[in-house]
Design a protein with these regions (language model features):
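Phosphate/pyrophosphate-binding catalytic cores of soluble transferases and nucleic-acid-acting enzymes
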Residues: 1-311
Length: 311
């Protein structure tokens, strides 16, 4: 088993706090596995750990990319794998923490991704999408890769375009590409720890309180500052939960209470999707929390599932 600990679970479950304490105990460094904390200038809405919360523990893959830039799972795997290799080479523990399931699974599996398309290919497909619509593009994908098409809806425009460009670029369907990469043995053998709450209402309450705290901490000013920097509301980073829900309020289309309620609901729905994703992994040791226990109890329960020694 590699000296790697993966701390996963839904949003607002306490992953950051546990990861920091485990890193301190096991001479580790934290590798963020959050698709939005990778962006600069987006601190409050992505719940980035503060310097105080980091407690002197080195954190990687936070504040790496400008919010107007595109970022992908493939790029994440390249950066994160380099971080993990460096940490392990120094005899330390890599604590991978976050809730972006595709990222962490791809990193641990050592999954390769289809190559970036040639210049102009994606733009051509996006033009065809605008001219013909999602239904027509999905029908085209169905004739090439019926399995991939069956998993998509006409509104899944980015995924339809991606599936088509993979086929045009490689001559292989995205389904075939995924099957080939899944057949490769995992790159790493980590300890998996998952955080969840026995009473779902406790998790939802934590999510609601987090949104309230974000607003108190200046989330609206953060969004205004991003827009002032010229970041498009349609940019991938700005489509994150915690940002796009407040565009309506800033444009005068709804009240702040309505925007906050929408953000809370979407965050709860996201938490459900995260749990569904991670529960497919039989290697995760789940820590079922009540929400009333002392953190030392959570840490003790986590340590019982870690086979290597602390420092």
């Amino acid at each position: 088993m590699d000296r790697i600990i993966c701390v996963v679970g839904p949003t607002a479950s306490g992953k950051t706090k546990l990861a920091v304490q485990l890193a301190k105990l096991y001479d580790g460094e934290v590798v963020s596995c959050d698709s939005m904390q990778i962006y600069k200038h987006m601190d409050i809405g992505t719940a980035k750990p503060t310097k105080e919360e980091m407690e002197g523990v080195a954190h990687h893959l936070i504040d790496m990319v400008e919010p107007g830039e595109d970022f992908s799972a493939g790029k994440y795997v390249q950066l994160a794998d380099s971080c993990v290799q460096d940490i392990l080479s120094r005899g330390r523990t890599a604590v991978i923490a976050g809730g972006t399931g595709l990222y962490v699974d791809s990193l641990i599996a050592g999954r390769s991704f289809a190559p970036v398309p040639q210049t102009g290919r994606r733009e051509a497909l996006e033009t065809q999408l605008r001219e013909n619509g999602g239904e027509a593009m999905l029908a085209r994908l169905r004739s090439i890769d019926p399995e991939a098409a069956a998993r998509l809806h006409p509104a899944d425009e980015k995924r339809i375009v991606r599936a088509l460009e993979v086929y045009e670029e490689t001559g292989k369907t995205i389904t075939q590409h995924n099957l080939e990469t899944q057949a490769i043995p995992p790159r790493y053998r980590p300890v998996w720890l998952g955080l969840d709450y026995s009473d779902r209402a406790v998790l939802y309450r934590r999510i609601d309180l987090r949104v309230d705290k974000m607003l108190e901490d200046g989330l609206l000013d953060e969004i205004r500052a991003l827009l002032a920097l010229g970041v498009s509301p349609k940019a991938t980073a700005m489509q994150a939960i915690g940002y796009k829900e407040f565009f309506g309020y800033l444009n005068g289309a709804c009240t702040l209470d309505e925007a906050a309620a929408l953000c809370k609901q979407r965050s709860r729905n996201y938490a459900k999707r995260q749990l569904t994703w991670f529960r497919r992994n039989p290697d995760i040791h789940w820590l079922r929390l009540m929400g009333t226990e002392d953190f030392s109890e959570v840490l003790s329960a986590a340590r019982q599932n870690i086979p290597f020694s602390a420092f």
